[in-house]
Amino acid sequence: NTPGRQFTGASSHDPEVRRNPSLALDYIVAPPRMAHYIDWSTRVYSVYLKHVAPEDIYPYSIDEVFIDATSYLQTYHLSAREFARKIILDILQTTGITAAAGIGTNLYLAKVAMDIGAKHVPADEYGVRIAELDEMGYRRSFWTHRPLTDFWRVGKGYAAKLEAHGLYTMGDIARCSIGQPTDYHNEELLYKLFGVNAE
C-alpha cells in the first residue's frame, strides 16, 4: 500500500501508522528519570495528606497507593466515590496530573476495580475515572473475565498452572475452592498448586 514502496514519513503512534501505511513505524527512547518520578510522586502524596492521615495511606508503588477511607466518609459527609473524586480533583488542580481510583470493600476488590474496572468506565469532564467493586459486583462483572493475568497477583506462571488444570476464570477457581474432597477440582488442588498462596 506504500506508494512506490517508499515511506512518506514516520510515526510512533500506533493508530496513525494503522491509518496510514505509508508511514514507517518509529519509536521513542525515553530514558528513566527516577528522581523526577519520585518528585512528582511526593507532590501527589502531599495532596493525600491534605485529606487523610499518613497511617491510612499504604504506598503500593511509586504511582499507586491504597487509602483506607472508612473513617473519613462520615467526617466529610461524602460517599466513597465522592471522597475519591474530591482527592482526584485536588491532585489535578495541584499537580496537573489526572488520577484514577478503584474503590472496593477490601484491598483486593479496590485493586481489581482500579486495574480492570476503571479502564472500562467513561472519563468525566476532567478525565477522572473511578470504578467501584463489592463482592457481588465482582461475581457479576469478573467471574467470567479472561485472561486471568488481568487480575492482581496472577502472573503468567500462575495462569498457566491454573489453565493446565482446567481453571480459566475466577469463577472456575471459586467453584474449585468449594469442590468436594472426592472431586478433582477442590480446595486441596489449589493448595497443592500454590501452597499458602492459595488463600
Language-model features: where?
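Gly/Gly-Pro- and Ser/Thr-rich, intrinsically disordered tail segments characteristic of DNA damage-repair
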Residues: 1-198
